Amino acid sequence: MPPRQRPPRRTPRSVVYRRRLGALAVLVAAIAAVWFIVASVKGGNDTKTQPTVPVAAPKPFRIVFPEGFTRAQMAQRVAAVAKIAQKERGRKPKLKASTYLAATKRPRFIPGFGKHPLEGFLFPATYDFTGRTTSAQLTKRQLQAFQRNWSQLNVAYARSKNLTPYDVLIIASMVEEETAAPEERQLVSAVIYNRLRDHMQLGIDATLRYGLHIPPTESIHQSQLQTPNPYNTSALGGHFGLPPTPIGNPGLASLQAAAHPAKVNFLYFVRKPDKKHHFFTDSLDAFNAYKAAHGYP
């Protein structure tokens, strides 16, 4: 009788598990090798992964409109800055003088003021722009800046003197042009209020310069003082009252001075030799004596 055969020994489960893990590792390694080869072919010889670097947005340009600048002067500043922007970036920006003049040419309805030319409402400040910024967008930002600053004013005193908000804006533009020392703004404003009260011609040289386009570097001649012009407020041939529009675009300090003049009775002022401060008086004799003493005509 042949000997009885034993059944084959079963492989332990732990061994089977290890073998399966090994086979899986081989499969993963094979897949990784194939992916590496394909990636190398697509990416060239450089097998290193290149990091993604975000592209920074171009730095905006900056345009500065000084207080008192007229609409025309702002257009000149736009032209100058646009030229710099073109030189640095190699392309013309949308912002340019001709489109700025066109965007600011027509009168608009301004809340609280009515429909007026934009001279006076183009708030002087520093504005950033890019190559895509349009003149219409810049103008809109200036008008918004004006409204924000104007909202800080209380024009109750001006209204008590029968002056409108637009009148206050006109006065502010004259204050801006006539003063170099900040502490004199309210004094110049007071002279304007007092002369309006006494039905006197304002005698503001800056209004005539604006109306006749006389540069500040040129002297005003006697014949020009007698020129019939709505912006001529001189005592020799000018009209009474305020000029028809602002003569520039005032900043917040001049707006505040126009709404809150100093409580003084001054009617005259003349620039001192330092070309920054003024001599103020309520006496015509004292005014003329000061001018004579310093060789003023």
Predicted features along the sequence, with ranges:
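N-terminal Lys/Arg-rich, disordered targeting/topogenic segments
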Residues: M1-R18
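Hydrophobic membrane-insertion alpha-helices, especially the h-region
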Residues: L24-F36
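Membrane interfacial helix-start segments of signal peptides and signal-anchor transmembrane helices
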Residues: Y17-A25
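Bacterial extracytoplasmic/cell-wall-associated proteins, especially those involved in peptidoglycan
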Residues: I84, L101-P297
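Signal peptide-directed extracytoplasmic domains
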Residues: R19-R20, V38-L153
